[in-house]
Regions:
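N-terminal metal-binding scaffold of metallo-dependent hydrolase/deaminase domains
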Residues: 1-42
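Active-site gating loops and adjacent loop-to-helix segments of metal-dependent hydrolytic enzymes
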Residues: 70-101, 135-143, 207-232, 254-257, ...
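Alpha-helical scaffold segments that flank or form the walls of functional sites
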Residues: 72-137, 156-165, 413
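Metal-coordinating catalytic core of metallo-dependent amide/deamination hydrolases
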Residues: 127-241
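Histidine/acidic-residue-rich catalytic or RNA/ligand-binding cores of hydrolases
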Residues: 207-219, 247-251, 269-279, 296-311
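His/Asp/Glu-enriched, well-ordered alpha-helical/loop segment
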Residues: 227-234, 276-359, 377
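C-terminal cap of metal-dependent C-N hydrolases
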Residues: 350-396
């Protein structure tokens, strides 16, 4: 981990890529106190030679379950409801130590892959807070309202004691409409309002869920959320594979945020079709997430961007969703969701950046870079990740990761 004194410069960056399609060549990025001060020809402070690097804004994993790396490969090749029952069965007896180790491994993995911020839904936000400060990654997490496993009032009490720190911010996690009573959902809503944060919830993931909520309430899931005042600018809706056109209008009107998890949805055979083009046309803030390592297996946002484009083309029989759209989801839209000035490399934005080794990318042409980033490059091409001006080298992170993975193996086989 390199922490430079106050000011340093990434010099002679081979390419600087922004999510509006702008690409700069052989320019410098001056960073001061964790913020981008200048992009151009200026040099201040220490110099970091970046002549071999493609520099991107940091990537935001807008939906994951960090401890579930422990369950990677545990129960694959099952549909969502069967898979969930197996996960909950394991999670009832999952030790706190194992949860924390799982979160630590996921954080090391994500940080080494270019993820600079992540939104976590699980049961150990205090661990995530501690680890985010230790490794310098932005984390947004909270205790999860889930009637199947926890008492809602106990979750409310725990959440109220959770405090913000430099790299961590509490959010309110609600597993889903179908896994919670209306009493629990309204308790979570009140909590989010009082704590001035947002609600992060799985919605309209499967046809079964849609039918169940319709049977229970007479409304489709997003309609129902709107009817109880749960649909607003502080709501993050995850999945939405089964959403009606009039519900998209409700999301737009409420200014709610949305998260697309293409790989997980395909793997769990949830069906439906996430209407990305319609969301973009309606100027809805759409972000992208890997989901957990138990349902995706990978936490690589480069893979996720590629799968995000390909799924749209397969489902809708057109190429109207472009590579650049997915880059926006992972960068500038992610930062809009978390409420931080970032996702674009420009003065006054946070210095959250990804450095890719251009020597591994070929044929290397400026006009092909956006295509390469989404369709060709994977996280293996990432060499450094910068968060809040702190430089993390992949090799160092991977050395720590190997040690933690050995501990995990020993725990699972003891």
């Amino acid at each position: 981990m390199e922490v430079h004194n106050n000011t340093y410069t990434l010099t002679r960056c081979k390419f600087i890529v922004n999510p509006n399609g702008e690409i700069l060549t052989n320019k410098n990025i001056v960073i001061q106190n964790g913020v981008i001060k200048d992009v151009g020809d200026e040099i201040e402070g220490d110099e970091v030679d970046c002549r071999k690097y493609i520099v991107l804004p940091g990537l935001v994993n807008a939906h994951t379950h960090s401890p579930m790396v422990v369950l990677r490969g545990y129960y694959d090749d099952a549909e969502l409801n069967e898979w969930l029952s197996k996960m909950w069965e394991f999670e009832r007896n999952m030790s706190k130590d194992l949860m924390k180790l799982g979160s630590e491994i996921s954080i090391l993995e994500m940080l080494s892959q270019g993820t600079t911020a992540f939104i976590d839904m699980y049961f150990n936000p205090e661990d995530v807070k501690e680890l985010s400060e230790k490794y310098k990654i932005r984390a947004f997490a909270g205790y999860t309202f889930l009637d199947e496993l926890f008492d809602a009032y106990e979750i409310d009490k725990l959440q109220r004691a959770l405090r913000e720190s430099e790299y961590f911010k509490p959010i309110v996690n609600v597993h889903s409409l179908y896994a919670n009573s209306i009493k629990t959902i309204l308790l979570a809503k009140q909590l989010a309002e009082e704590r001035k944060t947002w609600i992060h919830i799985h919605v309209s993931e499967t046809r079964k869920e849609l039918y169940e909520i319709k049977r229970r309430t007479g409304l489709f899931p997003v309609e129902y959320m709107n009817s109880i005042g749960l649909l607003n600018e502080n709501t993050q809706l995850v999945h939405l594979g089964w959403v009606a056109s009039w519900e998209i209008e409700l999301i737009k009107k409420a200014n709610s945020k949305v998260t697309y998890c293409p790989t997980s949805n395909m793997k769990l055979a949830t069906g439906g079709a996430f209407p990305l083009e319609d969301m973009i046309k309606n100027e809805i803030t759409v972000t992208i997430g890997t989901d957990g390592a138990a349902s995706n297996n990978s936490l690589d946002l480069f893979r996720e961007m590629k799968n995000g484009v390909l799924l749209q083309r397969q489902m809708y029989w057109n190429t109207r969703v472009k590579a650049l759209d997915l880059l926006r989801l992972a960068t500038i839209n992610g930062y809009k969701l978390i409420g931080i000035k970032g996702g674009k490399i420009k003065p006054n934005n946070v210095a959250d950046l990804v450095l890719i080794n251009s020597e591994l990318v070929y044929p290397l042409y400026k006009e092909r870079l956006i295509s390469h980033i989404v369709y060709y490059i994977t996280s293996e091409y990432v060499e450094k990740t910068i968060v809040n001006g702190v430089i993390n080298d992949k090799k160092r992170l991977r050395d720590i990761l190997r040690e933690k993975v050995k501990r995990l193996y020993d725990k699972l086989n003891s």
